[in-house]
């Protein structure tokens, strides 16, 4: 269903299909990633795994449109209600993304993004995943720079108008460490506690950013 919608309705190409083959790792064979509960990222869709009310689900979509990549993901609460902890985790992950985005403009430092995210997440008693990060994006799916979601203010690359990259903090309810499963794709929390993630692809402008993957229902007035 997802692949049909991407190809025939959006007139785009699902970038994940056939992506990422490497020695000891098969290419990804699905059009989206689906990460449930303690899965941090790159979860593989499965017809045998049944979602339950209260599960938190991340859907990650990357498409190629007119030769350029767009990468975005967000959280969904199965059944509309979940635990207080899971609900707060999802809210913090989204706000962390926004706080990282708010630091970006022509002349700002890349390290400011990670600093803003880490400071906020840890103030909420959660942790930021270190092993995976945002990335440059455009005609290439994964490109420089690496966009860390932790770090020090005033460090790293100086950003310039015209750059495009993703900000996609992965926020864990427990420790930040993760584990890669035997399928060589699925990443889970090391302590099996919940994880949540939000992602946007952004364009750096002279005064701030343009959110290239903005959703119609999303309030992005703080970036206008």
Regions found by a protein language model. Give the residues of each.
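Active-site neighborhoods and metal-handling regions in enzymes and metal-associated proteins
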Residues: 1-224
